[in-house]
Regions:
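Nuclease and nuclease-like effector domains acting on nucleic acids or nucleotide cofactors
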Residues: 2-5, 10-83, 92-176
Length: 176
């Protein structure tokens, strides 16, 4: 039997839930915030160097959750090494560290992978800490569609290159 590539592509579009996606399922991962982080206290919380290390959950927690969520998402590729258990609203922007609604298995092998999201996380984090972007605006950008936000915040991405800027007021190299 001859296979039709168009039919295969259509099947992929229709069955969507079987393969890893660049954006999380909004019903499973809508995002959740850390109520202890507000616009009024960013200079004492997220903008303090190393702050994310103080709230990051232990690896045993995120590794266990990643395996569970890979099954819940119905990904065809079930190898945990091919995913980063990532916070939709980054810790560096006051995302909730342990709420499963803020974590999802983000594919590593994609044009819009965890590395690209990290670039946006850093740029918006720096924008918030330098007063160029409001905290709620930055959080919404991730919760709504981080890929569209990546395209929209080009100027910040140029100004605050991940890994090439001295982080100054806060954060840490893992910034997420």
């Amino acid at each position: 039997m001859k296979k039709n590539p168009l039919v295969a592509a259509m099947l992929l579009l229709v069955t969507g839930g079987c393969f890893a996606a660049d954006l999380p399922d909004p019903t499973r991962t809508p995002g959740a915030i850390n109520p202890g982080v507000t616009q009024a206290n960013v200079s004492a919380t997220i903008c303090v160097k190393g702050w994310t290390r103080t709230v990051r959950p232990p690896m045993y927690y995120t590794n266990r959750l990643k395996k569970l969520q890979i099954r819940q998402y119905g990904y065809a590729d079930t190898n945990p090494r091919n995913y980063e258990e990532d916070h939709l609203i980054p810790l560096s922007l006051g995302g909730n560290p342990t709420d499963p609604r803020n974590l999802w298995p983000e594919p590593r092998r994609s044009a819009w992978n965890a590395d690209r999201k990290d670039e946006l996380e850093f740029a918006l984090y720096m924008g918030v800490c330098h007063g160029e972007v409001g905290l709620d605006e930055a959080r919404r950008a991730f919760a709504m569609n981080w890929i569209e936000a990546y395209k929209r915040y080009g100027a910040l991405l140029q100004r605050y290159r991940y890994g090439s800027v001295t982080e100054g007021r806060g954060g840490d190299s893992s910034n997420e």
